[in-house]
Amino acid sequence: RAVKRLWALILLLPIALGKTYLVPIEGEIDPALAVFVEQALARAEREAASGVPFLIDTPGGRVDAAIRISDRILQTPLPTLAVVQNAFSAGALIALSCRQIVMLPGSEIGAALPVVALPLQEPQAADQKVISALKGKFRAVAEARGRPVELAEAMVDPNLEVPGLSAKGEPLTLSADKAVELKVADLKAASLYEALQAAGFSPEVERLAPGPRVQVARFLTSSTVAGLLLALGLLLLLVELFTPGFGVAGALGLAFLALYFAGGWLAGLSGAFELLLFLLAVALLLAEALLFPGCGIAGASRAGSILASVYFTFGENALLVLSVA
């Protein structure tokens, strides 16, 4: 009878373990990707998955999105694993948030100096206040996961010199071998399958992928596309402001800004309030063009409405990105 019970437990073991849900974190870290990660973790928790490995290959991205992903990973009760192809900048914070880190051949982790990115301008290093705040976040995550705090901070602050690893003025970047040697990562693996086996995850893997809505949102909220839409939209509306009537410049400007806000809405960044502000700006634009040509009050009001809706949609963190300089 005892033997039968043992065999029954063995047969039920794969069911008890559940699936492993592989979540790819590829390309730029943006708000829509954060939505995808939250959805993936919610599904994994709902279906009692055996664990959630993240396949990370990113050059960086937005600070707010990276922190949002990091916080969600830290909150989940499920085992998490970072399988690192490249985890630069924002990717480093996400990798450090996982319970285990496995480095693939040729992978690197680090280089998390925050920069300020304005549309159509070269990124500039953030001020010391921002660096200090982000360094604190890296420190807190490293402490939570038992990683070397000093090395995590050195990934953010270029003024922290690590002898033999990084010179002063350069944020820390570690190769796969160095990351394992210094306990930033747990081990190296030759492939994703080997990484999953070594970390003790179920061999039954389902790779999750973002749906069409998230894919469109990722495209529209990427730093390049969102920056172009915002810059061109505001520029064309500025031209329309000094042009009698309502013409092509105004129509194109509104179209670009509509796409800009659509990306924020799809990514869950904007709601009814921001939409109402934008619609108010459109109403003022049409009122000035059709009813009160040349009225400066309407023009100033619509400009204020547009700028306010931009701010409330993306916030001040929209200017902060974590990327390889």
Where are these regions (language model features)?
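Positively charged n-region of N-terminal signal peptides that target proteins for export
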Residues: 1-6
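Hydrophobic h-region of N-terminal signal peptides that target proteins for export
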Residues: 9-18
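Soluble extramembrane regions of membrane proteins in the secretory/endomembrane system
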Residues: 17-217
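Catalytic-loop motifs flanking and including active-site residues across diverse enzymes
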Residues: 134, 250-253, 299-302
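Non-cytosolic juxtamembrane linkers/loops
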Residues: 170, 174-276, 282, 296
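Hydrophobic, low-charge alpha-helical segments
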Residues: 258-325
